[in-house]
Amino acid sequence: MAQAYVGQKRIRRYYGNIREVLEMPNLIEVQKSSYDLFLRSGDAEGHQDGEGIQGVFQSVFPIKDFNETATLEFVKYELEKPKYDVEECQSRDMTYAAPLKVTLRLIVFDVDETTGAKSVKDIKEQDVYMGDMPLMTQNGTFIVNGTERVVVSQMHRSPGVFFDHDRGKTHSSGKLLFACRIIPYRGSWLDFEFDAKDLVFARIDRRRKLPVTTLLYALGMDQEGIMDAFYNTVDYKLQRAGKGQAAGWVTKFFPERVRGTRPSFDLVNAETGEIITKAGDKVTPRLVKQLAEKGDINLLLPFEKIVGRFVAKDIINEQTGLIYAEAGDEITVEYDRDGEISGGLLKVLLDNGIEDIPVLDIDHVNVGPYIRNTMAADKNMSRDGALMDIYRVMRPGEPPTVEAASALFDSLFFDSERYDLSAVGRVKMNMRLDLDAPDTQRTLRKEDIIACIRGLVELRDGKGEIDDIDHLGNRRVRSVGELMENQYRIGLLRMERAIRERMSGVEIDTVMPQDLINAKPAAAAVREFFGSSQLSQFMDQTNPLSEVTDKRRLSALGPGGLTRERAGFEVRDVHPTHYGRMCPIETPEGQNIGLINSLATFARVNKYGFIETPYRKVVEGKVTDEVVYMSATEEMRHTIAQANATLDESGKFVDELVSTRQAGDFMLNPVEAVDLIDVSPKQLVSVAAALIPFLENDDANRALMGSNMQRQAVPLLRAEAPFVGTGMEATVARDSGAAIMARRGGIIDQVDAQRIVIRATEDLGAGDAGVDIYRLRKFKRSNQSSTINQRPLVKVGDKVVKGQVVADGPSTDQGELAIGRNVVVAFMPWNGYNYEDSILISERIHRDDVFTSIHIDEYEVAARDTKLGPEEITRDIPNVGEEALRNLDEAGIVYIGAEVGPGDILVGKITPKGESPMTPEEKLLRAIFGEKASDVRDTSLRLPPGAYGTIVEVRVFNRHGVDKDERALQIEREEVERLARDRDDELAILERNIYARLKSLIMGKEVVKGPKGIRAGAVVDEDLLGQLSRGQWWQLAVADEDTAKEVEALNQQFDAQKRALDNRFDDKVEKVRQGDDLPPGVMKMVKVFVAVKRKLQAGDKMAGRHGNKGVVSKVVPIEDMPFLSDGTPVDLVFNPLGVPSRMNVGQILETHMGWASRGLGIKIDEALQDYRRNGDMTPVREAMQNGYGDDFYAETFEGMEDETLLEHADAVRGGVPISTPVFDGAKEADINDALRRAGFDTSGQSIVFDGRTGEQFARPVTVGMKYVLKLHHLVDDKMHARSTGPYSLVTQQPLGGKAQFGGQRLGEMEVWALEAYGAAYTLQEMLTVKSDDVAGRTKVYESIVKGEDNFEAGVPESFNVLVKEVRGLGLNMELLDAEDEE
């Protein structure tokens, strides 16, 4: 027979032109690799220390007690096997986790009291259980308390150093105040900033600012050291007046600095006396060049030019130690009336014979005096004072001591336990400041702080650029593993404190590590993270695409991230570095826009947490197949061509100028300059956007809505892949885990709806049974109440290869994503029923279940142990008629298959009531007749209002030691039978394989001895084996020793595998039979699953893939729908006005292409019917060639056997599927060509007739096939009605919302409307008896019951509340009746 393997994949006609050299990476790799690194960090191979669990333990341990007589060290950790597998955890509401076992070593020392020397006294090692560590499932999710959750990756500011300014907002003058911030991975932030007076300040953790020199003093620098670190020194030598020369200062000349300026004095060469340039003349670049060529020149400056300069070093009298000037002092001079020097620092220096003065090289143009001015303004002069100041800022109100201040300052930035830059932070800091510290240096150094301040000062001097904090080189991704690591570290640190106290409080010689450890804080931290962290989210399981997108999310929110209110426009905006890393399209609408993003299709996260995107290398104008991944920072240095640049066969660029990206800008560049090219046109969008065909023809806003709405598409009863796809569909279905892939090649042994059994033929290991059993999930409920249902695609005897789709899941069709249906649509107005984007649908859709979906709701009830006695699940409920119990079995639980409606009992339950005191008569009666039944009340689980459906599954959970009822036992029996069936099948295949191998081993060999009736010396053949049962084959001893050994080994392997199978079976049965872990106080729990079939109806929301959404307005009989000239009625009618203003033209192109696809399919169908009549294959081949185009046909189908080709033709009778990748899809010419081949007009329009009158519409109408989705906004879930119901406690007004069974709010505007109409009585009724007049509403109810129609309104409760509130303000309000007044 033909193998199904070839006929399986529906072959798509591919319209892309660009060859893709790189396979798309696995879509959930981000999640899996990150968590894997976290869990397996203790493995020997290839992991650095300091990562994952290993890193956390190494950073917290060893723990010493307070007087250091004992140390608790970490040796290694190990994750044991999880107790329950994924499926069991889901059905039992457990967390899928593995016990974490840590080996700890306790070392006790003997301390010599006199010398203080330590010697080891005792070493104890022990394995300690440290709580459970949640494991990730195959699909990158976590099962927490039975529900699937996803941990979203977080984008945060990368650790490192950032330079910025306030954009002129702080000071009224609009002056730019520069700032620099050092952000560690954990620890205190350090900021440096300028103020309006150009002084430099430092802040620690955003507290009060201190002069930056205070910080430098605290680092152990003195004034001279500080000046030396930030400024160059220039020597001024005094030249006395003489030989016609005025007195002046000789100093070195820097020609570069005066370029383009006009000096205010003559520039004189000190050696020769020649004037280089006259005062007021411009210094030309040519002159500067000439001077530079001459080498060093000394200038003679006028005498007064030294005034206002600053001394560079302390100037001291060597003999007496007298200080004339300190580093940073300003050189001043005072003159008397005669112009003689009478005072100032200069006089002091000259009087003491100091004529060679070292001066700071500050010229107020290229170099500013900011640090020197700050030092002058700083009141501190010493390290101690500086430390005290820092202490006062960090711990206000505490009296500082030098020791405490010094310890605090050291622990802030230089203690690796408190401060961690992380490897990323160190690498970023080295890059920004040109340092070369190794990335193991994770704390700050003095050099780093000086380099930061120097960088900040240079910015103020106009050198360098500020950083762009939205650049993806400055934002990094924290994935699951890292988030979990941080959380676990918090838990361990909490635990560390407890361990320290315990080590000091016990007799350390007698305890084991186990006694010191309480693992609760660590386990609690993990639980808290998965349960309540903002980044751990309930997985969006609406369809496979929404699952994949959820795992590829990048959120800027969450702990350590931004908040919605604080995030400005810049953070949310698209940045050039997002190209190929983050999707510019897919982000939510609303207040989270731009804060939650999606990873682009080819992007990956590198070891430092930066997002990388792949490029192909271009060498000398030729594109190679070598792929390199680049982060945003690395990419800045390259010139990158776009993927759609035209290339010739050899891979050379055709055009001379190519459109490229360079450092974030787009420009045309010559071919020689290009060194990289994009890998694929779809690398800049995310998965959801890459699923939109003709995305390039849609406006971005609508594409955004299209991406978001595809995630809300409900899985339909019959999934159907789109005719017009993009080629991404199979990838999403594969990576989401919705469809089942074969783990290894083999032959299908058994198939039914529940499971697929494959006999493996590849990858067989020794001791491998060679059986793969795939259990299919049938009608399981997803997180969003949609259905998860898997269907087999293979037949018994089919050959499958590794990675082939063997079963479809929800919203997949033949292994392709299928979230909607292909329907015939027309764009035309129809009696106003498509006003405001409404959609008109044909009754055919209702009749043929085109858009029908199944939804499963879960209801649960628990029987608890109350103070008054246990609750009971039973059929025996007081005051309930037999009619209401018709669906319950004898245990009081609803049957599977029962159809239920609102108010029906699902599980009968009674609760004991409090005893009321009994009269003597009652006591007597009770003594005579025994128990009375009225001391229990009915607390049964009933279906809520508005819910209908069929019971599809019931699960009963019993506490350990509680007797099981009949229903529980029946469910248990079914489960055990299923397990036994699995075991038997696996055993059967195992036996078949083993006996086949045994037979091949002994066939044709000579027998030495055997069972009764077999003579020695016989040769093994079919006849001989036929006389024996298979079990007796083992008893044949063959002469060949090697064979005998192999047979023995095979026998042992067979026994071992049988044993393993039995053990596994017993283990599972044991788990099924034992009781369940229920919450405290719960004796028994029942879960009931109700499935409901929802057909498409008026009020349901539908959408296309291009953001064209609308609500169904009317279901029209088929005969009234517009129809085509061949009698085909249209399925949906869209409003044509929805296209031009929204600019999503992609939907029109899709409609045309889909129409062509359907037409070509019909032609293939006609050819197949011909073939069935006369057996001629030629028309079929011609139709396929016409349908797929000559080139594609020649590549794919030309040499195919007839039978296989027929299978393919049969698969595309409804329409030839095509794929048109985004930005590289079918062009207008392709669409015209396809329409022509299908026999349609290239306008894409058809003559349409009115179904009601039969008349032709006035002009041709665009009709075609479009892929339409039904979204998860169903009118059944939203609509609800209330007659009477719950009221709010305080105001006594009805509650609001469907969940509370609330009413409609009558707000102030509605009141105005009624006032405007003068409807006084209606208004009074609305505000009193229909709302919160308690007495009035009971009266109304009574009168309605009695059939009367008189009532009167009282005082609304909210008025009483108002009176009480006014009294709360101390004002007494009393109400007077009108009669009392008189």
From Swiss-Prot:
GO terms for molecular function: DNA binding; DNA-directed RNA polymerase activity; ribonucleoside binding. InterPro entries: DNA-dir_RNA_pol_bsu_ext_1_sf, DNA-dir_RNA_pol_bsu_external_1, DNA-dir_RNA_pol_su2, DNA-dir_RNAP_su2_dom, DNA-dir_RNAP_su2_hyb_sf, RNA_pol_bsu_bac, RNA_pol_bsu_CS, RNA_pol_bsu_protrusion. GO terms for biological process: DNA-templated transcription. Its EC number is 2.7.7.6. It catalyses: RNA(n) + a ribonucleoside 5'-triphosphate = RNA(n+1) + diphosphate. It holds the Pfam family RNA_pol_Rpb2_2. Keywords: DNA-directed RNA polymerase, Nucleotidyltransferase, Transcription, Transferase. The keyword Hydrolase does not apply. One of its GO terms (cellular component) is DNA-directed RNA polymerase complex. Belongs to the RNA polymerase beta chain family. HAMAP family: RNApol_bact_RpoB. The RNAP catalytic core consists of 2 alpha, 1 beta, 1 beta' and 1 omega subunit. When a sigma factor is associated with the core the holoenzyme is formed, which can initiate transcription. DNA-dependent RNA polymerase catalyzes the transcription of DNA into RNA using the four ribonucleoside triphosphates as substrates. This is DNA-directed RNA polymerase subunit beta. It comes from Paracoccus denitrificans (strain Pd 1222). The lineage of its organism: Bacteria, Pseudomonadati, Pseudomonadota, Alphaproteobacteria, Rhodobacterales.
